[in-house]
């Protein structure tokens, strides 16, 4: 059963806040900024080049969209994982992997 508007808002807000919290150590270590404003999470890099990853909810389709490295990643709610995921990869591990790839760091 698809998420209602209210369920989507609550779950997407919680997912973005969890991502912000869980990426804080990597952000401190790697020197990039995490900005969560108006329901959108931005990962802002100055090195190795000025870049921004944008993580935002898309309410009409009940997905969280990640715009990073010239691509769009669309994560749907996974009842089995109790999180937003793309091909069974949850949001936080996806963002961690994309960030490390961008920074040229191994996991």
Which sequence ranges carry the predicted segments?
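N-terminal intrinsically disordered, cationic/polar leader segments
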Residues: 2-54, 58-107
């Amino acid at each position: 059963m698809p998420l209602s508007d209210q369920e989507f808002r609550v779950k997407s807000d919680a997912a973005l806040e969890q991502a912000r919290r869980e990426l804080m150590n990597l952000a401190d270590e790697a020197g990039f900024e995490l900005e969560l404003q108006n329901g959108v999470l931005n990962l802002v890099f100055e090195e190795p080049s000025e870049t921004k990853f944008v993580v935002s909810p898309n309410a009409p389709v009940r997905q969280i969209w990640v715009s990073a490295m010239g691509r769009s990643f669309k994560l749907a709610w996974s009842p089995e994982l109790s999180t937003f995921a793309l091909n069974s990869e949850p949001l936080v591990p996806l963002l961690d992997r994309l960030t490390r790839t961008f920074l040229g760091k191994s996991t």
